């Protein structure tokens, strides 16, 4: 559904062209310093406007509606709203007849019987990643300064140079995908459970809430399939668990081993592309040529790093609370 987490529980709501999108977060320890300004750096990283991103610009100011008093968390659920002001819903009126390839238009209509808000992708829109970033800001505070969560763009359109990848997309007049890597340092040994609540499965669960994510790998990932066992195994060097290599990506048996947690995600090309495509005309029953109008990202991967950090922090903050490594009352 629309919720994630066991103790640090995140619930997202809203639609792209509705009045607002927002997030409700339960399980936050009391006493964490928190103001509107704390959210701004990460929200700014997610914003549109840079080369290769959508021209749609919103202020993206977080309005804290509950759970904060005297600039500190109270221990009650926190609700944060983001207003939608720069919408152009007329761009989407034609979509009732032409479901966009690669988007949720067709399946959403079938699942919700045509009652869904289709404007701008509705509840399926990447705009709802604002909610994830906001939750991630709080999650990072729970993790504390000793744990760093950092994601970087590694590849655009198959090229390690993002600028070159974007230029290739502009020349082709088409959208492109990318690869983003996240590294978490400072984690204690022992987070995670075997099987269904492993660190990998929990992070993957959160990661796939980000629209456009099509794959994830930890450590050596798919390259491990081409390695020998002695090559892939990480030799343990000392009692702290430090290893000579990190092909496991910081997780063994679903449990953190004290080495950096490393994973990468594949981000598909933006489904809304300037190129003419063909799709079913629901009204006529015929497959017809179709082009997507509106304001869209050329490469959504450019805006994914801060969102990836957020969902990783959400998952790890939940583990920290479950392991009682974070107190219910925050202490500096």
Curated annotation (Swiss-Prot):
- E.C. numbers: 4.2.3.5
Gene3D superfamilies (alphabetical): Chorismate synthase AroC
Q: Which domain of life is it from?
A: Bacteria
* Keywords in alphabetical order: Amino-acid biosynthesis, Aromatic amino acid biosynthesis, FAD, Flavoprotein, FMN, Lyase, NADP
Needed co-factor(s): FMNH2
**What chemistry does it catalyse, as a reaction equation?**
5-O-(1-carboxyvinyl)-3-phosphoshikimate = chorismate + phosphate
Pathway assigned to this chain's UniProt record: Metabolic intermediate biosynthesis; chorismate biosynthesis; chorismate from D-erythrose 4-phosphate and phosphoenolpyruvate: step 7/7
Q: Which GO terms describe its biological process?
A: amino acid biosynthetic process; aromatic amino acid family biosynthetic process; chorismate biosynthetic process
One GO molecular function term of this record is:
chorismate synthase activity
GO-annotated cellular components: cytosol
Which free-text remark accompanies the cofactor?
Reduced FMN (FMNH(2)).
- Binding-site residues for FMN, renumbered to this chain: 123-125, 253, 268-272, 295
Pfam families associated with the record = Chorismate_synt
* Similarity section: Belongs to the chorismate synthase family.
- Quaternary structure and partners: Homotetramer.
Free-text function comment from the UniProt entry: This reaction introduces a second double bond into the aromatic ring system.
Q: What is this protein called?
A: Chorismate synthase
Q: What organism does the UniProt record list as the source? A: Chitinophaga pinensis (strain ATCC 43595 / DSM 2588 / LMG 13176 / NBRC 15968 / NCIMB 11800 / UQM 2034)
């Amino acid at each position: 559904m629309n919720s994630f987490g066991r103790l640090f529980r995140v619930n997202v709501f809203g639609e792209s062209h509705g009045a607002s999108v927002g997030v409700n977060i339960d399980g936050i320890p009391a006493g964490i310093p928190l103001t509107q300004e704390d959210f701004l750096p990460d929200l700014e990283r997610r914003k549109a406007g840079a080369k290769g991103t959508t021209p749609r610009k919103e202020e993206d100011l977080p309005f804290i509606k509950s759970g904060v008093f005297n600039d500190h968390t109270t221990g009650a659920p926190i609700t944060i709203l983001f207003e939608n002001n720069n919408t152009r819903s007329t761009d989407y009126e034609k979509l009732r007849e032409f479901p966009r390839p690669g988007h949720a238009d067709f399946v959403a209509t079938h699942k919700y019987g045509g009652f869904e808000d289709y404007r701008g992708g509705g509840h399926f829109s990447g705009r709802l990643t604002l909610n994830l970033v906001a939750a991630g800001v709080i999650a990072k505070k729970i993790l504390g300064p000793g744990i760093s969560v950092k994601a970087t763009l590694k590849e655009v359109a198959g090229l390690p140079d993002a600028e070159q990848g974007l230029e290739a997309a502009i020349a082709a007049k088409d959208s492109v995908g990318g690869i983003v890597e996240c590294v978490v340092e400072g984690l204690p040994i022992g987070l995670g459970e075997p099987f269904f609540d492993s660190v990998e499965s929990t992070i993957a669960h959160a990661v796939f809430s980000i629209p456009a994510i099509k794959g994830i790998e930890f450590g050596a990932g798919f390259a491990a399939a081409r390695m020998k066992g002695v090559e892939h195994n990480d030799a343990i060097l000392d009692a702290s668990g430090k290893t000579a290599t990190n092909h496991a990506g910081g997780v063994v048996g679903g449990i953190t081993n004290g080495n950096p947690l490393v994973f990468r995600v594949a981000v598909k090309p933006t489904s809304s592309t300037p190129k003419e495509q063909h799709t079913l005309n629901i009204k006529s029953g015929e497959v017809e040529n179709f082009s997507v109008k509106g304001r869209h990202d050329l490469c959504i991967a450019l805006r994914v790093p801060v969102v990836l950090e957020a969902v990783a922090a959400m998952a790890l903050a939940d583990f920290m609370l479950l392991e009682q490594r974070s107190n219910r009352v925050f202490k500096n």
